[in-house]
UniProtKB/Swiss-Prot annotation:
Chief site of localization: membrane
The name this protein goes by in its record: Acyl-lipid (7-3)-desaturase
Molecular function GO labels: metal ion binding; oxidoreductase activity, acting on paired donors, with oxidation of a pair of donors resulting in the reduction of molecular oxygen to two molecules of water
Highest rank taxon of the organism: Eukaryota
Keyword ATP-binding: no
Organism the protein comes from: Rebecca salina (Marine microalga)
Amino acids binding heme: 53, 76
The entry's keywords: Electron transport, Fatty acid biosynthesis, Fatty acid metabolism, Heme, Iron, Lipid biosynthesis, Lipid metabolism, Membrane, Metal-binding, Oxidoreductase, Transmembrane, Transmembrane helix, Transport
Listed transmembrane segments: 123-143, 154-174, 185-205, 244-264, 286-306, 315-335
Amino acid sequence: MPPSAAKQMGASTGVHAGVTDSSAFTRKDVADRPDLTIVGDSVYDAKAFRSEHPGGAHFVSLFGGRDATEAFMEYHRRAWPKSRMSRFHVGSLASTEEPVAADEGYLQLCARIAKMVPSVSSGFAPASYWVKAGLILGSAIALEAYMLYAGKRLLPSIVLGWLFALIGLNIQHDANHGALSKSASVNLALGLCQDWIGGSMILWLQEHVVMHHLHTNDVDKDPDQKAHGALRLKPTDAWSPMHWLQHLYLLPGETMYAFKLLFLDISELVMWRWEGEPISKLAGYLFMPSLLLKLTFWARFVALPLYLAPSVHTAVCIAATVMTGSFYLAFFFFISHNFEGVASVGPDGSITSMTRGASFLKRQAETSSNVGGPLLATLNGGLNYQIEHHLFPRVHHGFYPRLAPLVKAELEARGIEYKHYPTIWSNLASTLRHMYALGRRPRSKAE
């Protein structure tokens, strides 16, 4: 169990005790102080600021002890308001450290797309969205309740798994990116739908917001690029003879994401980390609620049905729901970041196709791909427009089809590749060819 933020930081009510405005911090200094965060070349009091953050305290808390430069830029689509944040300023990044700079090209693109987002919504969910969300959530709750009363059936259990996936794609995803509503409370409440369908909001935020979005396809930092030997996803992965067949067992293997939801989440929660990356101690106040919600899911979705109808059939139906939802989610996320020509990101001197020094705009666009059009976007929460989503995660998915032509033109004008597959099949075929190529034994330097 993680120590509470209060215990970790002592009884002091702020970081200013013993700290002057001229203090210089190394990145290690900040990493050891979860009450601090870095933006650009400055260090700020994250603990003091989080309660005033309009988007919710949990977002700021997750970046305690971290560099939030690109996170702020990506979620607010503007330059850091240094003068407004001066009262939270506690020092500067040491001269020995290289600050992360805002991507001016990205901010220029943000200014262009701002003109295409209706001012009445400011990029949050339009009124029509709430009808869709209500239908999906209501259908899932009604179907689950019906099967508790009438008993589990295999086909309805599969349908329920699909509805769980739609909740993940259409509701919790936008909510946990802060894209549904200007109200942090609304986003937080609907973000907890991740716990309702068997996941964990706090683990999702750590995996997706803190790690994946800022380090997409980074060979060391993106948790979605770690398959622990089961798959060879990137050129830096060690090769095994089993990888000859990875393009064949990839799709069946995606159903195994279910076991992550059922088992791995609990151990990661207890260890307060994701894929070895610690969750900020500043977010420690979310530990107990997150653990209780995980146990509540087990009680509601696993223990209660088995208590009411103890049988192998009931267990199979429970597994069918979780595996169906897991497969649907994993399938679309996987094909959007693993395809022919996709960039892999690594440090200078690595064998990756892109270095971490590339612009934010280029790193996000060339590690993602789009598929299909507005119809699939309506069904899948706009995540078939993965490029637009990675560039503008706090813009509601309903706007992505409208933004896509401008984004494509802007990126191509800057010499940045924009990959859009017309069909799911064409995207899948590219993914399988990509996995086949990575599954071949790499040549040694002597060959």
